[in-house]
Each structure stands twice: as C-alpha cells, then as structure tokens.
A protein has these predicted regions:
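Phosphate-binding active sites in nucleotide-utilizing proteins
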Residues: 32
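DNA breakage-rejoining catalytic core of tyrosine-based enzymes
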Residues: 1-2, 37, 43, 49-71
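Active-site/binding-pocket entry motifs
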Residues: 46-48, 75-76, 84, 140
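Mixed-charge, low-complexity intrinsically disordered segments
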Residues: 48-55, 93-121
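Generic beta-structure capping elements
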Residues: 43-45, 73, 137, 169
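Residue-level signal for well-ordered alpha-helical positions
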Residues: 28, 81-84
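Basic, Lys/Arg- and aromatic-enriched nucleic-acid-binding interface segment
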Residues: 1-28, 36, 47, 64-65, ...
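Short, basic (Lys/Arg/His-rich) helix/loop patches that form interaction surfaces
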Residues: 1-9, 18, 68, 85-94, ...
Length: 174
C-alpha cells in the first residue's frame, strides 16, 4: 500500500485509530483536530453525488456532531502528516492545490460542492477555502471513491484480506 498509494495510508490509519466512516475521514479538517486534548470533532462527511457528478460536503450519517478521543499513536501520525503537507506545499509551490467549497441553494435546500484549484488558478469569489487532513501530495483531497478502490485492490491481492472494506476499520475502535 505504501508503494502503490501512499496518500491512502493516512485515512486508513485515522479510521483504524478513531473508528470513522470513510466520508467522515475524508471530511476531517485540521480545525476539527485537537492534538493537545487528543480528540476529533466529527461534523461533516464527503460523498459523491452521481446525479450532480460532484463531490458534496454534507452532514455525517446521523446528522450529529460527535467528539472522538484518540491516543498517542494517532497523535504522532497526525503531527507527521501535517509536517509532510507543509513540506509538499513548499515543494509544489504554485502548483500545490488548495481545497474549496461552494454553497449551493436549490429548492430551499443548501449543500456544499467540493473543488480544488492549483495556486495558479483564479479563485471564484463564492469559493471558501477548507483545510482537509487527508490530502494527496499535490494538496488535493483524498476522496472516498479512491479509498474504496484501494481497499478493493487490497482485498483482491492480499491473503487474509478477502472481502475487506474500509467500513470494517470502524470496528477496530472501542
């Protein structure tokens, strides 16, 4: 996994140590993490909307905000990830992607579309920047669809991981 898809490792580690769903893991921002208190605030989820052909930022499955505690291992993983992201931002320079959401109103409903733009692209006025935790080296978000593909690949290639799904990581957290 480390050689084939390194960006998939962080979300898998977060899900393993904190018991998050795939969309919640991808929707986690640095503002949701308190490293001092060792807790995460889970308040959003990312999902793909096949009708709109867009990734949508929305509420969690139960539409409730919750706090999840974690230990020293995940604390160290997150500190290392933050350091790596800052290094990548410097290396990629203006080609580093920034992540944004746009509020959309349709028939008395509000939802948020996800976008990512390189530093060279002009940012529309209605885009708001968001600081996700699970990023690819170029700064773009590691999406649930990619993680599902990685897990499917692992289940086919590794003995003992047949029928492995990302959701099973939720059951490792107690």
């Amino acid at each position: 996994l480390e050689k084939k898809n390194p960006p998939a490792i962080l979300p898998i580690q977060i899900a393993y140590y904190a018991g998050l769903r795939i969309g919640e893991t991808c929707g986690l921002t640095w503002q949701d993490i308190n490293l001092e208190e060792q807790c995460l605030t889970i308040k959003r989820s990312i999902r793909y909307d096949g009708i709109k052909h867009k990734n949508i930022i929305g509420p969690t499955k139960r539409k409730k905000v919750r706090i999840v505690d974690f230990g020293d291992t995940l604390t160290e993983i997150l500190k290392a990830a933050r350091k790596e992201q800052l290094k990548n931002r410097m290396q990629y320079g203006e080609l580093y992607h920034r992540n944004y959401y746009k509020e959309v109103h349709v028939k008395n409903r509000v939802y948020y579309e996800y976008y990512h733009l390189a530093g060279t692209q002009e940012v529309p006025a209605d885009y708001k920047e968001i600081s996700f935790v699970c990023l690819r080296p170029d700064g773009s978000l590691e999406l649930p669809s990619t993680l599902s593909i990685v897990c499917r690949s692992v289940s086919k290639k590794l003995e003992g991981f047949e029928d492995f799904h990302f959701h099973q990581l939720r059951h490792t957290y107690t």
